[in-house]
Amino acid sequence: MTRNAPPGQESTDLAWLVTPAKDLVENFSIDVLKALAGYLEVIRQESEDTDNQVDAATTYRLFDFQRACRIIQGSCAVYGRKVDHVYELTISVVDLVENKGQDDGNTGSRRGAGRRKNFNLGSTNYDLADIDSLKQEALANFEKTVKEEKKSIDAVRMVENAEVIESQYERKSCLVAKPTQFMFKLNYGQLNRTDEQILNAKSRPDVIGKVKDFEIKKSKVKHDQQILYSHDCYRGNLDQFTLPGARWMPDNKELAANFGVADLEVELDLEQEHEKISAYGPFKDPLSGREVVPPPRWFIEQEAVRQNQEIQSRATSRAITIAAKTLRDSQGFGSQPTRLSQPFVERHRQSNHLNDFLSFVEGRVNKNRPSTHLTTGLVDMFVDNFGSVMQNDEPNTSRRPDENYAPMDFDDDFGGGGDDDDDDYIRNLSRRDEKRAPAPWDELDKNHIIWYTGDENLPVVSKPVKKITKFQPKPAEMLARKQRREEKINKSRRDEFMETHDYLQDYYYWRSAARINPIKDWKIESLRTAILAEKKRRIKEKTAKIREARIQNMQRKRTARVIPVEQFEPVTEDIPTSNRRTLGAEYDDVVDEDLAAEVELSMFGGGFDDDEEDVRPRGERPPMAPNNLEFDALQTDFDIPPAEYVPLRFEDIDDAELNSVINLPGNLLIDKALPLLKKFAENRTDREQMAYEMAKAYEDVDVAVSTLQEHVDKWHSRMEPILEEGETRKEYDVHAVGRAVIGQYDIEGGTKRLLDLVMDRPWYEISRYFLSCLFMCNVGNVMVSEDMELPLEERINSMKITLLKRDMHCEMFKEAGALDA
């Protein structure tokens, strides 16, 4: 600011210069850069014209627009902040230039459209704010703010969790209103329609229970409304399980009582065992005898919270005032389309009125099920008692509403909402599928991204990264670890043999199918053909018995002319009667479908014993005399003795059949198995022989252990000392062995035989010395020579090593630090 106020002419000139800036008050959408560029050009031009005329002491410096324009053009990130600051400073300058000295009272008298707007900009300090200091202060308080936010979030969560837990563990007592037509008739005390099914509201309805699933406890019947009020929890009203739609929040006592454990039994168990019985089961249902496992606690809590939210959503979406609806009676008469009411209604009791209704069976009820509809009573009661009051708010009614009556909210699901397709109920339920908005405390947990302009001087801390290197263990150590793990496992001799046997079958003989399909076992395959042959023989024998019995019991039409049995039987055998149920499909051994079912059942051993006769023929009825035309009494049946049953013996099986079915992995087991089968098959049946062979194969160690096990044991005894001795050897270092070889020479240029160098050395170090000599020969430390005239097998004995120099390359590299780099 200047020391003296400018004169009037100069004030007018300055006001003309800042006219575009004054327009920012009315229209901020102008091009600020273009306007500031115009300011800069005008100031430059006037400064050049008046530079030599105006004294420096009388120069009025209001604002450096050139500096402001450069700041805006140089920093695009802070463009908006700078423009706002320039705008505020410009407006304050205009107010000071035009309004200064007019505070003598004349300003207050100027009213109307010509009055200038006053801007309260606060302080007239035009110094730019120190952004760096503000940022440093904000960064210093950032951690403190974050901690306070976390504490507040934790406090909110604790309060909410406490409220949720308190609501969960609160003993809920719900009032259920049930139509009396499902319970008791008024004229006689007998259950009515107890087997009617209750369906849910899916597109394909599922049965969720029957009427008889409900028990009435602590109930009161109101005959005028035909509704039964039950002041009890849902679990007391349900017989065994909670049906879908019921809102039940159990505690430990209810869990123990509702899943088959009575309170008396709990007390007796507590007195005897002095321990608390878990309320989460499993328990045994005393009615059905089956084991009932209740859901886990976390599932019960989750379902309780979800059901509570669902109740609120349903109550909000379905609470529609009656002003826009028309209630119809229970018989379906009225202007609205036909809409049947729902079978069950649950409600909360407030004062003595039915204020709201929630459907017990969730979803829309199928209207084609008249067995579960309220035919009389409930809706008529609503129309008679509340219909006229609820219609007071309609615009066309002249009756004044009751002042002492509050309009109620209820489920207007009876009229259908005026839609022809009657889908208003489903449309209102669509709100349950909407996604809930996230809670405010969930948003606070997210890490918000802080935007920086690039001008901040943020402290940067760099920490060294710890490099973790994991080396591969040595082969000897890996082998030792494996042996230590295997030593801890206690295995029997048979398990070790089977592991070796499976390994050879999979990797040596390529017989992995034996492990994939355990059914293909030699113990079963060896008896498969014999078992099938015996089954076929029994089927044929039983089929013959059944046919014989049916022929004997065949009822013949008694006429004046009776055909003798000797003439009738050959005809029936040549032309069998086809079965109408098989539609012409004949069986090989069986003619009738019932006979085929019996034979098939006998093949699987279903309900038939070997030593029991399945069919006992009643005997043949001889024909009556030709001269007797009347029906006489039936003659006494006579029994035919059953045929003797001969069980299958393995001695009947020939050697060729046994050799064709037995497939064993070795000749030794075949040689042992065949005599064994013949030896014990003389006095045993097929089942006894199968049981003996199965037990023998698993229990007799002498049969299971073969020459393969002996070879494996010998191989183990020979290889284990070698492997153990190999683990005790030192690691091979080519440079260390090379130094030992050079150390045996006294002077450079000396020559020694390889046999002299390895004298008194272990046998495994001979190859190490030889490889070290070859390595030093490549780097120029020694020279290897041999007698070329000798044969190839004897040249190794004549090999000579000559020392050329003692300095090794590895030591030179180590001194220079090349190996470490």
Curated annotation (Swiss-Prot):
PANTHER family, alphabetized: CONDENSIN-2 COMPLEX SUBUNIT H2
InterPro entries xref list: CNDH2_C (IPR031737), H2_N (IPR009378), Ncaph2 (IPR031739)
Molecular function in Gene Ontology: chromatin binding
UniProt lineage: Eukaryota, Metazoa, Ecdysozoa, Nematoda, Chromadorea
Spans annotated as Disordered: 389-426
Null mutant phenotype: RNAi-mediated knockdown leads to disorganized chromosome morphology, causes DNA bridges in mitosis and leads to chromosome segregation defects in mitosis and meiosis.
Protein name: Condensin-2 complex subunit kle-2
Quaternary organization: Component of the condensin II complex, which contains the mix-1/SMC2 and smc-4/SMC4 heterodimer, and three non SMC subunits, capg-2, kle-2 and hcp-6 that probably regulate the complex. Within the complex, interacts with mix-1, smc-4, capg-2 and hcp-6.
GO terms classed as biological process: cell division; meiotic chromosome condensation; meiotic chromosome segregation; mitotic sister chromatid segregation; mitotic sister chromatid separation
GO cellular component: chromosome, centromeric region; condensin complex; nucleus
Top-level taxon: Eukaryota
Statement: the UniProt record of this protein carries the keyword Cell cycle: yes
Keywords: Cell cycle, Cell division, Centromere, Chromosome, Coiled coil, Meiosis, Mitosis, Nucleus
